[in-house]
């Protein structure tokens, strides 16, 4: 998989066509989801302009977007799954302890003691806050989730490429995977 250039931030993705006029349903990953459409043209992973948002309206699970480029329903549907990037320079300055999800992907995850805990595969939000999907944990198959809160993620260093976590006992462990965990009292 090709990684975006450092000056690009993955901000949205096309979920499919909407209607017959070439509008697309778009999932935004911006902190304020509507902001994804105010940063100018969307770029592909190589920095080439692919779509320019003209109008966006909120709908369940995303936005319906009309683009300046002429699209019909078939062209809009063919774009399903397309990742949309914007220039980092177009985005607002981040506060301390704020991160773009795309900057976190692929970082090494370690415990408080520095022991390797895997790699960050994805950041999800199913409505109750961000969850980190961690994969490659030693002695564990598959991936597991951890809430992205200061309690469980006390330190992130983009510069060092490391996320330090303090998961609850048995989260991310072999015991959790096997359905074990704390015995019932």
Swiss-Prot record:
Family: Belongs to the RimM family.
rRNA processing found in the keyword field: yes
Biological processes per GO annotation: ribosomal small subunit biogenesis; rRNA processing
Quaternary structure and partners: Binds ribosomal protein uS19.
Main location: cytoplasm
NCBIfam families: 16S_RimM (TIGR02273)
UniProt feature coiled coil, ranges: none
Gene Ontology CC terms: cytoplasm; ribosome
Keywords: Chaperone, Cytoplasm, Ribosome biogenesis, rRNA processing
Pfam family, one: PRC_RimM
Signal peptide: none
Domains as described in the record: The PRC barrel domain binds ribosomal protein uS19.
GO MF assignments: ribosome binding
Protein encoded by which gene: rimM
Protein name: Ribosome maturation factor RimM
Ranges of residues in domain PRC barrel: 96-171
Subcellular location per the Swiss-Prot or TrEMBL entry: Cytoplasm
Region (Disordered): 165-185
Functional description taken from the UniProt entry: An accessory protein needed during the final step in the assembly of 30S ribosomal subunit, possibly for assembly of the head region. Essential for efficient processing of 16S rRNA. May be needed both before and after RbfA during the maturation of 16S rRNA. It has affinity for free ribosomal 30S subunits but not for 70S ribosomes.
